[in-house]
Regions:
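Periplasmic-binding protein-like
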Residues: 299, 303-341, 469-474
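Aromatic- and charge-enriched surface segment that lines or borders ligand/interaction sites
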Residues: 102-146, 165-168, 254, 302-304
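Ligand-site clamp/hinge motif
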Residues: 226-274
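Gly/Pro-rich hinge or "lid" segments in bacterial periplasmic/extracellular proteins
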Residues: 87-90, 181-234, 239
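N-terminal lobe/hinge region of extracytoplasmic solute-binding protein
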Residues: 52-108, 139, 205-206
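Long beta-strand-rich cores associated with HINT superfamily self-processing modules
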Residues: 485-513
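Structural transition elements
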Residues: 327-369, 386-389
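Surface-exposed binding/hinge segments that line
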Residues: 112, 116, 149-194, 213-214
Length: 513
């Protein structure tokens, strides 16, 4: 039947070229999952499933969608001009064309970025994509004071040519990570008629494998049949009904029983050994972008002495803290997680293997040399129950070393502060920005590296900054938070699950048996 072009596809001769490109993309993606269970060509299409999140996603307006739950859902409905490759592991942080024909043309010493959009693209409501919609979307991010506003702070101006389908961004300074910004859901377009107000209650039309709908007050992802872009494969399941179940035991029990088809979020620590052994074929744990650590302020005694900071690093048992965090921590000894540019695995870690118990004897020796036994140290963190438990455990460890540790209220400055770093884009500077108070020169060095147009050289410089923070014991890395997904027996886990390092479970990859 003739009608308007199929969403996500080109028309005429361009459509033929697009289909060839899509076929190549599917072949390239088959079997390349580093985490997850793989995505095969024989994935079954159709059917419906139920998904439980561990907490409400908040606003699903792409200008505002920020938390892990919101971005997991929004990524399926709002593709940006660029996007991250639909793959697991390090490959999933690679920027590829999304709504744009190709990667940006960069000129003027890195200050001008020009994109050309694919022709014939339409939103989920059938309206055509226009270049000026991207200008409107950036205006919304700024007008709504979105958490994504900071990502676009370096944009001086943006111009659109609807006739040619071109968008030009002009930056105030070179930014080697701007491609990551253009691949975030904050950069995804919505029609120019969408108001400059939060539309999360009724998510606006977008372009992606799914469209978001509200059915009887419940969030539902509805597959866009025929959708496909060269770097964004179409979805498998027709309909995904999303609910919120904060009780981890109930989520696990209902998924194992088949009352739920998938659950995203932590499971009870006491249930993990059983799940990992009995349901290994449908349970996935993947380290994402989040790093957990204690930042050590060196502005006051005794933490201003590097020997005290080193002593604390030697004493830490990352596995023990992982148990406090419900078993969702992969031990590590860097600020940058493994899937972010600039990560280099230390060999060996400067303060011992993070998967082994801490070296309390070496820690005690350093404290004696620093004459710090009995010194007062304050410890702080966030208000959440898990944060409070980690802070208390850390204070107990310091007391065991002979320090007089005191836990302060959330928000009160402390000499040792628990941090969970999870930027919305895999940009090394975002991690180091959170630590700029530890070293006045860190922010300047990070700006210099981010402006470097050579990505390989920049990655080496990020690694150097990371290693310097760790070796000087400015931080106490505990490890990398893991995202977990449990699937029911209805899901074809052998062929149909991909864990993305930035967005978590890729819902478009899931299919039924």
């Amino acid at each position: 039947m003739l009608g308007r072009p199929t969403p996500g596809l080109r028309s005429g001769a361009s459509r033929v070229r697009g289909v060839v490109a899509c076929a190549a993309c599917v072949l390239a993606l088959t079997g390349c999952a580093g985490e997850g269970f793989g995505v095969g060509e024989d994935a079954r299409k159709g059917g419906s499933l139920t998904l439980a999140l561990d907490r409400p996603p908040g606003s699903l307006d792409p200008a505002l969608a920020t938390g892990p739950q919101a971005r997991l859902v929004a990524w399926q409905a709002y593709i940006a001009p660029l996007t991250l490759r639909r793959a697991s592991g390090q490959e999933g942080t690679e920027v590829v064309p999304g709504l744009a024909r190709r990667l940006p043309a960069i000129s003027d010493g890195g200050l001008t970025w020009r994109l050309e959009l694919r022709p014939g693209l339409r939103y989920s409501d059938g309206s055509p994509l226009r270049a000026s919609d991207l200008v409107h979307s950036l205006r919304r991010v700024r007008a709504l004071d979105s958490p994504g506003k900071r990502l676009f702070a370096g944009v001086d101006s943006v111009e659109a040519d609807d006739r040619r389908g071109r968008v030009t961004y002009r930056l105030r300074a070179r930014d080697g990570a701007f491609a990551q910004v253009l691949a975030s859901t904050y950069a995804a377009p919505v029609p120019a008629r969408v108001p400059l107000s939060d539309q999360g209650g009724r998510p606006p039309p977008g372009i992606g494998p799914y469209r978001l709908a509200r059915v009887g007050g419940q969030l539902v992802l509805v597959r866009r049949r025929g959708f496909r872009l060269p770097e964004v494969p179409g979805a498998n399941v027709d309909r995904i009904a999303v609910s919120v179940e904060p009780d981890p035991e109930r989520r696990a029990r209902r998924t194992i029983a088949g009352d739920l088809d998938a659950t995203v979020g932590s499971l009870p620590a006491q249930r993990l050994p059983d799940v990992r052994s009995r349901y290994a074929e449908r349970y996935d744990e993947s380290a994402g972008l989040s790093t957990t650590m204690f930042a050590l302020s060196s502005r006051s005694d005794p933490v201003d002495d590097v020997r005290v900071r080193q002593a604390v690093n030697f004493a830490v048992d990352s596995e023990a803290f992982g148990r406090v965090l419900d078993g969702r921590l992969a031990p590590g000894c860097t600020v940058l997680p493994p899937k972010v540019s600039g990560y280099r695995e230390p060999d060996p870690c400067p303060y011992g293997d993070p998967a082994e118990p801490g070296d309390l004897r070496q820690a005690a020796t350093l404290l004696r040399e620093a004459d710090a036994e009995g010194a007062r140290v304050t410890v702080g963190g966030g208000p959440g129950a898990l944060d409070r438990a980690v802070v208390r455990s850390f204070a107990t460890l310091l007391r065991k070393l002979g320090l007089r540790a005191r836990v302060v209220r959330p928000g009160v400055p402390a000499q040792a502060t628990l941090l969970h770093l999870r930027p919305v884009v895999p940009d090394p500077r975002a991690y180091l920005r959170a630590l700029r108070g530890l070293d006045p020169q860190l922010a300047r060095a990070a700006r210099r590296v981010r402006a470097d147009p050579d990505p390989e050289r920049a990655a080496e410089d990020w690694a150097t900054l990371d290693a310097d923070l760790v070796e000087r014991a400015r931080v106490v890395p505990l490890g990398y938070d893991e995202d977990s997904t449990l699937l029911s027996a209805r899901i074809d886990s052998a062929n149909c699950f991909r864990a993305h390092p930035v967005f978590g479970a890729d819902l478009s990859s899931i299919c039924l048996e």
